[in-house]
Design a protein with these regions (language model features):
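Cytoplasmic helix-loop-helix junction between adjacent transmembrane helices
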Residues: 140-180
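Conserved MFS/SLC helix-loop-helix module at the cytosolic interface between two early adjacent transmembrane helices
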Residues: 94-134
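Structural signature of the two symmetry-related core transmembrane helices
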Residues: 110-125, 353-369
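Symmetry-related core transmembrane helices of the 12-TM Major Facilitator Superfamily/SLC fold
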Residues: 202-220, 459-478
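Cytosolic juxtamembrane N-terminal segment immediately preceding the first transmembrane helix
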Residues: 1-58
């Protein structure tokens, strides 16, 4: 009962502190204050957020699922093809700090709803773009990226406000499972719709319907105001090793600071900086794999004589389906394994989280390198090593976010997530698909046109991903040197 009383005052004051009150002055329900089984309502909110995250990443990876069809339809080189995902990611990362600023100060439910409505509408509109309007198609992908940024920046902070200690790790793991699940479903949905209809445009007409459902669920099931926890409740170890704070939430700790002050504080946080650079390496590798791997596998099969070259618009989509299935399966297993490993090892080592991330990055890089080397001779071995590479990459998703949530004070967490998105995409997957395509073009230009060099150009381009993954592991190792001190600072 004391906890209910402690949480009541910040919930009532949230509208004053962050501008969360509705314009007409109506009072929305508060999750933490609800006496009708608040735990059940919290899980309903998480279910809605997970569904939205699923749609978010399906939209993200629909285009890579039909990449070969798009190349034939618009007549694109590898470089121009990679530009599609680069534009999406650039707009995504540039919008993220804006939504981080808004999410720390204004009503998060309204921002989420506007983002879902915007990206779903643009996706539907892009499905009607004709062959002569490639630039409009590129622009539409950028606009979808802006809408997606609102969701990825704000949704994790809502989950962090609803749960604490061990539960937060579990719930965040469930939320982040929908990154690989959504990504894999994006490949499979795109390939399946293109194959069944004979027209890739239909692949872009499914998720807007799902987005409309997500928006309806958001309106009906997510409270208008969700109480923001203070540092005493949130900025502590997820493992529960640090004892529950005795002081009551102090509304004065939520005093406003400028965005520049928030950024200045975050830049001095070594754990945040190093883990963000580690995640940047993750983003570089996953971005390149996500866009180019189905096409790389197709070219490997062509060189081996397993499939014929695609000379028409509706191309073989089996690699997108298989790679999508691998992404879903390894993503679920990896995130669950990462969360469980973190939960167990934190009891023995306070530096367990960054060490888990570093180890998984090193192993993933090795598996990816082996997959590239055997691709020309054994396609089955290639699939196996790609699966292991993706499995160990997926281990990090929830763990990296967990690190951020306990080394950054709560009132700066939306900004921290936004900055992490900005850095990881600016130096990671914003450029990696385009870079891989440009290197592939350069290799092909220096050799005579052939199916063999079409494959080798992509193979040589991908090698850079293995080395970037090793650098990512190094940054996570650096994080382990600072994480204990920064965690204590966040608690204070």
């Amino acid at each position: 009962e004391n906890e209910d009383t402690d949480l009541l005052l910040p919930a009532l004051l949230e509208g004053q502190n962050y501008g969360a009150a509705a314009a007409d002055g109506t009072q929305g329900p508060s999750v933490s204050v609800s006496r009708n089984n608040p735990a059940k309502r919290n899980y309903l909110v998480v279910a809605v957020l997970c569904f939205g995250n699923l749609i978010n990443f399906i939209d993200w990876f629909i285009v890579p699922g039909i990449l070969l069809d798009l190349q034939k339809y618009f007549g694109l080189s590898d470089g121009k093809t990679g530009l599609l995902q680069t534009v999406f990611t650039l707009c995504y990362m540039l919008a993220a700090p804006i939504f981080g600023y808004l999410g720390d100060r204004y009503n998060r439910k309204i921002i989420l709803g506007a983002g879902i409505f915007f990206w779903s509408g643009v996706t539907l509109g892009s499905s009607f773009i004709t062959q002569s309007h490639y630039r409009i198609f590129v622009l539409s992908r950028g606009l979808v990226g802006i809408g997606s940024a609102s969701y990825s920046t704000i949704a994790p902070t809502i989950i962090a406000d609803l749960f604490e200690e061990g539960k937060r790790t579990t719930v965040l793991s469930i939320f982040y499972i929908f990154i690989p699940v959504g990504s894999g479903c994006g490949y499979m949905l795109a390939a399946g719709m293109a194959k069944s209809t004979g027209d890739w445009h239909w692949a872009l007409r499914v998720t807007p319907c799902m987005g409309a459902l997500a928006l309806l669920l958001l309106i009906l099931l997510v409270p208008h105001r969700i109480q923001r926890r203070t540092a005493a409740h949130r900025a502590r170890s997820i493992s529960g090793m640090i004892r529950r704070a005795d002081e009551k939430p102090d509304v004065h700790t939520a005093a406003k600071t400028t965005w520049c002050q928030d950024v200045g504080s975050l830049v001095k946080n070594c754990s945040f900086v190093c883990s963000s650079l580690g995640q940047t390496a993750m983003a570089f590798v996953t971005g390149a794999l996500g866009v180019w791997m189905p096409l790389f596998l197709y070219r490997a099969q062509v060189v081996q004589g397993i499939v014929p070259p695609c000379l028409q618009e509706s191309c073989n989509s089996s690699n997108s389906l298989i790679f999508g299935g691998i992404t879903v399966g390894t993503g679920i297993l990896g995130i669950i394994a990462g969360a469980e490993a973190a939960r167990r090892l934190r009891k023995k080592n306070n530096k367990a989280d960054p060490l888990i991330c570093a180890t998984s990055m090193f192993i993933s890089s090795l598996c990816l390198y082996i997959a590239l080397m055997v691709a020309q001779t054994n396609i089955l071995s290639t699939f196996i090593f790609i699966a292991f590479g993706e499995l160990f990459l997926s281990v990090n998703w929830a763990v990296v976010t967990d690190i951020l949530l306990y080394v950054v004070t709560p009132r700066r967490q939306s900004t921290a997530i936004a900055l992490q998105i900005l850095v990881s995409h600016l130096l990671g997957d914003a450029g990696s698909p385009y870079l891989i395509g440009v290197i592939s073009n350069a290799v092909q230009a220096r050799n005579s046109p052939s199916l063999q060099w079409s494959f080798r150009s992509m193979q040589y381009s991908f090698v850079i991903c293995a080395f970037v993954g090793v650098f990512g592991g190094g940054f996570f190792l650096l994080t382990s040197f600072y994480i204990e001190e920064d965690r204590k600072e966040a608690q204070r």
